[in-house]
Amino acid sequence: ALGCNYVIPVVMKGQTGADRILTGTPLIEGDKPVRTNSDYWSVLPKDYVLYCVKYMNPWHASYLRRGIDKITENGTVTTSERHAQSVEKDEVCGITTRSLNTAVFPISTTSTNGTTVNCDLLLTFNDDNECTITSGTTGISATGSGKFVEDGEKNSWGNKDRDAIYLEYDVDFGFKQIATKDTLVLQTRGTNKLEVFAPKYKAN
């Protein structure tokens, strides 16, 4: 599941260093209602945890981004290089899971009136970690390709080899066309990020 749809329930059966486990008080004495159904408890039980299971594909992570943009706007072509003095200071961007083999890479540009225009690039990978790039945003077209390379960036930040994604793509925003070459150096997988959710009980 890509969202908070499935959980692993864990119930506490014993304790050490505490007086007791807070098992709650049902509205009806002697009743044993479902723990997650708050309507049947006068004091909610605190003796369980719901661990959510959520799928993240291999490319889901935060990356350090650098590259070159060739921008065509109103017939004028300019080139913009994005590259900090050190990799650690490059732009931080995120790639998230869309499906088993597809990841979402959000990019943006500025329109002629100064507003920000966003586009979700869809990176669809094959078994060789090569990807095709398309647009997931209505009204904006994109084409391109790329590749994920394990330890592709040698002696990168922290003096260690780092995984990387190399992308080359063209995006047509309508008012502006951008041809981009990107290098995305893995920063963190983000698997230790705390996410909380509020479960809702639904009777069958």
Segments and roles (model prediction):
Residues G3-N204:
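Intrinsically disordered, low-complexity regulatory regions in eukaryotic proteins
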